[in-house]
């Protein structure tokens, strides 16, 4: 079955998705007594009774075996890698993004709520489309993509499907990436490490109570960031700055100081909130707030700070500069590269400082976005 008719009820979507599953990777769960299992795909580490699902609602226990989503997408699109955002990886390249349904958090401002909250919100009805990894990789090549990205919903809870796709992608010469809330576990990161090159974490707050409101905890995300860096994933971190929620100087300072404690070379993207989904009370984030967050990050010691979602309004904060001599290295307007000056080995052309990232030996120019819907 490839789609859900308009107006389908929640139970119908559940019934469809129950048929789009496979056994979870044995590395990602353990069997307990009384046909219970414990899942390690995300930081909730849910103990799941027979016949029940985890917090994510898409990983479930059937007779003592854990099942995970398989064989479909809830959305795909081809657009610049800068949109993910990754600013220190394959500048200007196209990223072929795919996602499934479900999430282990329930953020009230989620911009992808139609896919992430599809099993919690009766208004979030998305038709799952049956596909194979081979088809997705072929379509990525047709669109001119160089990176496959698991995104839109939370990819950790659909890691098995992402790995199946990434195995095909890497065999074909493509890079791979996760765009994630970072609520991981050591087991899932070990499972992903051979197949994932780039990893973006949404560090949504630096306050435990704020994370509780979103349905999670802060510490698993912080530990995931530490592990991602130590394990050699290329890591970039994004914080959506929301007025009245996470924009205080104190919270932003603690967050930036934490990132510096992992590495001052982690790119930190501070992005502007706009009213979405259920969060319609705060004002939209202005450029002055992003500039303040960037100044806090610089004071803490971060070398690469970017402001997003307000193209042309944030001055130099869309660009990459050498932290040693301040030479302009990559100039951007939104997702578009307007100038590129890095050397083939990723160095500043003036002082030869090595800029951390995953750089192409030759800048291949900016490619515009190409939306794609699978057939």
Name each model-derived stretch.
Residues 2-50, 249-375:
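Auxiliary Fe-S-binding modules of radical SAM enzymes
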Residues 45, 49, 59-62, 106, ...:
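Cys/His-rich metal-chelating microdomains
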Residues 61-198, 367-375:
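Conserved Radical SAM active-site core
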